[in-house]
C-alpha cells in the first residue's frame, strides 16, 4: 500500500469530546470517526486492525472445532418473550416496530435466536455436541455512551454457543472456549486476567470475564498474590469483619441538622466511619430495597440483587418510592422498620457484628447512636447477606493471601448457561433411551472492537499508539526523507517490493510532505517498525530501522532489510 493511496486523515489536536486515550488516539490517527453519540465509522486503518483481530478469533475458534454461521441482527420479539427476557433486559435493548406493527429488537446478544435455530434441526444425542459462532454488530441503547469503543451503542462481537448432552459435555466445551480465549488474547498482545464474574442478564450457573488490565477500565477486579484467585469486585467474596465486642449502650437519638450523608454525620459526631452504618435504597422488580452496610464500606449492587432474587438490575429508588414506604432520605436505618411485600431490608453480614454504631433515626435531621443490630433490628424480618464490595483489607477467600486491586476492560466472557434457554424455548433432544432432554448450553462472547480499544489503552505513549505486531494496521512503514529524490524513492521501492515478497504487511510513505510530518504520523499511527531512507544512510548503502516500542534505531544494509525486519517482527 502507498500512503498517497491510503485514506488516513490524521488530526494534530485532541478532540474535545474524547474521554479516554484509546478514543483520542483512534480519532487522531485516522482509525475512526464519530457519527453520533456512541456510533463510529471505521476508516481503513481501523478496519485493517479489526480484520486482523477477527482473523485471530476465527483461527482459534476453528481450531476449537467451532463452526461459523451468520444470524439476523433483527430479531422477533416473540422468541425473547418466550425466554422471559423481553422485559427483563430493560431499556438497553433497542426495540423497533415494522410497518405491520410487529415488534423486533436489534440484537444485543443471540441466545434466543441460536436456540430457536438449533432446536428445529437437532433432535438426537448423536448430533451433539455442536458449537456455532458468528462475528457481527450488536446493539445496546447505553444510557451514557462514552469511552469511545469501550461503551458504544453499536459494537462488533464474536458470539459462540455450545450445545451438549450433559454437564460433563458442557464442562469440556467451556474449557475448550476458555483455552481458546486465552490463546486469542495472548496473540492479540494483551495483558489480561480471567476473573470470576456475575452472569447478569444472560444468566447461567458460572462465568468468567477476560479482563484487559488498564487504568481506563470500568471494571474493578481483585486478584490474589499467592494463588490463582481473581474476581470481578461485583462477585468477590468479602469476609465478615468483626468489631471488638463492647458492652451494649442505651439506644438514643441525637440531632444532626443538615447532615444527610454518613460522612457528614461522622464528622459532626466525631466518629470513625466504621462506627456508623449507611443506607442505600434501590428499586428492584417494583420493590423498594433498603441495603445497609458499614459506613466505611460500599454497597455491592449485584449482591443486593441476588439477595432479593431480583430479575433486573437495581436502580436507585425515586423520592416518590421512598415516600411510599415511609423512608426519609439521608436519615434511614432498619431500626423500627419491617419488611412488606413492597419493601425489603438487606443488611450486610459485617453490620451484624458491630456494636454501638450510629445510623439514621428515620426522621429528618436526626440519627440514632448506640445501635446494636442484633438487639435493635427486627432480625427475623431482615435479609442478612454479604452485600458489601470487597476491599484492600480483605484476604483471599481461597487461600487467605493478600489481595491486589486493578482496573480492567472486559474483552471477553464465557458462560455456563445450562438449561436456562433450552427449557424456556423447548430445545430438546432424544437420549440413548429415547427420552427427551433439554440441551445443555454455554455461550461465549468476545468484544472485537473493544479488544482494539483495550490494546491501545495498554500500548501507547505521548506520541501515539504502540501496536502489538499481530493487530497493527501495517507491520512496517518505509519513510523516504524526500519523496522528490529519485534515488531515495527507487531504493524505497526496492525495499518495499522485498518486504512484500517476504510476507511483511508494509506501507510505503510516498507523500511529498516534510520528513517531520511523516515521522509524527508514523509514531501517532504506531507502526511497529519504521524504515528510514535518507541520503546519509544511502552513502553507506544502509537504511535505519526504528522499533516503535523501544525507540531503538538500528542501521541495516539495504540488501538485508527483509531478513532483519522479519527477524525483528518475530519479537514484537
Question: Model features per residue range: what roles?
Answer:
Residues 87-104, 212-223:
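Acidic, His- and aromatic-enriched active-site or binding-groove loops in soluble protein domains
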Residues 111-116, 144-158, 168-442, 448:
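Extended, low-hydrophobicity, polar/charged segments
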Residues 38-43, 156-165, 209, 411, ...:
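Short, hydrophobic beta-strand segments
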Residues 496-556, 560-561:
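C-terminal structured "cap/appendage" subdomains that terminate the fold
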Residues 1-28, 114-145, 256-260, 458-462:
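Charged, low-complexity intrinsically disordered tails and linkers
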Residues 265, 442-471, 475:
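C-terminal, non-catalytic macromolecule-binding modules
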Residues 1-98, 110, 161-200, 297:
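TRNA-binding/sensing appendages of the translation machinery
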Amino acid at each position: 500500500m502507498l500512503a498517497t493511496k491510503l485514506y488516513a486523515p490524521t488530526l494534530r489536536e485532541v478532540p474535545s469530546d474524547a474521554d479516554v486515550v484509546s478514543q483520542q488516539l483512534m480519532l487522531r490517527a485516522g482509525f475512526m470517526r464519530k457519527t453520533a453519540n456512541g456510533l463510529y465509522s471505521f476508516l481503513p486503518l481501523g478496519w485493517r486492525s479489526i480484520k486482523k483481530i477477527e482473523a485471530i478469533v476465527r483461527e482459534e475458534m476453528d481450531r476449537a472445532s467451532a463452526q461459523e454461521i451468520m444470524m439476523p441482527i433483527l430479531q422477533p420479539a416473540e422468541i425473547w418473550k418466550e425466554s422471559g427476557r423481553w422485559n427483563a433486559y430493560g431499556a438497553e435493548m433497542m426495540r423497533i416496530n415494522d410497518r405491520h406493527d410487529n415488534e423486533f429488537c436489534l440484537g444485543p446478544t443471540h441466545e434466543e435466536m441460536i436456540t430457536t435455530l438449533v432446536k428445529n434441526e437437532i433432535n438426537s444425542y448423536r448430533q451433539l455436541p455442536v458449537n456455532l459462532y458468528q462475528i457481527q454488530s450488536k446493539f445496546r441503547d447505553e444510557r451514557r455512551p462514552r469511552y469511545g469503543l469501550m461503551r458504544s451503542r453499536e459494537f462488533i462481537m464474536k458470539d459462540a454457543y455450545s450445545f451438549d448432552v450433559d454437564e460433563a459435555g458442557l464442562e469440556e466445551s467451556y474449557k475448550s472456549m476458555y483455552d481458546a480465549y486465552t490463546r486469542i488474547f495472548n496473540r492479540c498482545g494483551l495483558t489480561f486476567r480471567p476473573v470470576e464474574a456475575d452472569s447478569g442478564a444472560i444468566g447461567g450457573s458460572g462465568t468468567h470475564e477476560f479482563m484487559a488490565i488498564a487504568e481506563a477500565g470500568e471494571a474493578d477486579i481483585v486478584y490474589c498474590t499467592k494463588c490463582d484467585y481473581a474476581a470481578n469486585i461485583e462477585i468477590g467474596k468479602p469476609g465478615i469483619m468483626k468489631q471488638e465486642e463492647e458492652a451494649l449502650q442505651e439506644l438514643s437519638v441525637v440531632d444532626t441538622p443538615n447532615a444527610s450523608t454518613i460522612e457528614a454525620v461522622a464528622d459532626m459526631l466525631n466518629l470513625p466511619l466504621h462506627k456508623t452504618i449507611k443506607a442505600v435504597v434501590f428499586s428492584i422488580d417494583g420493590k423498594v430495597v433498603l441495603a445497609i452496610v458499614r459506613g466505611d464500606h460500599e454497597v455491592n449492587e449485584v449482591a443486593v440483587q441476588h439477595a432479593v432474587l431480583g430479575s433486573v438490575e437495581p436502580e436507585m429508588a425515586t423520592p416518590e418510592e421512598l415516600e411510599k414506604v415511609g423512608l426519609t432520605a439521608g436519615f434511614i436505618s432498619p431500626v423500627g422498620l419491617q419488611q412488606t411485600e413492597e419493601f425489603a431490608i438487606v443488611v450486610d453480614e459485617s453490620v451484624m457484628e458491630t456494636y454501638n454504631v450510629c445510623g439514621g433515626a428515620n426522621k429528618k435531621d436526626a440519627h440514632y447512636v448506640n445501635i446494636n443490630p442484633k438487639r435493635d433490628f427486627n432480625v427475623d424480618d431482615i435479609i442478612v447477606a454479604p452485600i458489601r464490595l470487597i476491599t484492600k483489607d480483605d484476604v483471599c477467600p481461597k487461600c487467605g493471601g493478600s489481595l491486589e486491586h486493578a482496573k480492567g476492560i472486559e474483552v471477553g466472557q464465557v458462560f455456563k448457561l445450562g438449561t436456562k434457554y433450552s427449557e424456556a424455548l423447548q430445545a430438546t433432544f432424544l437420549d440413548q433411551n429415547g427420552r427427551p432432554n433439554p440441551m445443555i448450553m454455554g455461550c461465549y462472547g468476545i468484544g472485537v472492537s473493544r479488544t482494539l480499544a483495550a490494546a491501545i489503552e495498554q500500548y501507547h505513549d505521548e506520541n501515539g499508539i504502540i501496536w502489538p505486531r499481530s493487530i497493527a494496521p501495517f507491520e512496517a512503514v518505509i519513510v523516504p526523507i524526500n519523496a522528490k529524490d529519485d534515488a531515495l524513492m527507487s531504493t524505497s521501492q526496492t525495499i518495499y517490493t522485498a518486504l512484500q515478497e517476504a510476507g511483511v504487511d508494509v506501507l510505503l510513505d510516498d507523500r511529498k510532505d516534510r520528513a517531520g510530518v511523516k515521522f509524527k504520523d508514523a509514531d501517532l499511527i504506531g507502526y511497529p517498525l519504521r524504515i528510514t531512507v535518507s541520503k546519509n544512510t544511502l552513502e553507506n548503502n544502509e537504511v535505519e530501522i526504528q522499533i516503535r516500542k523501544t525507540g531503538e534505531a538500528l542501521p541495516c544494509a539495504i540488501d538485508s532489510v527483509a531478513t532483519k525486519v522479519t527477524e525483528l517482527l518475530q519479537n514484537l
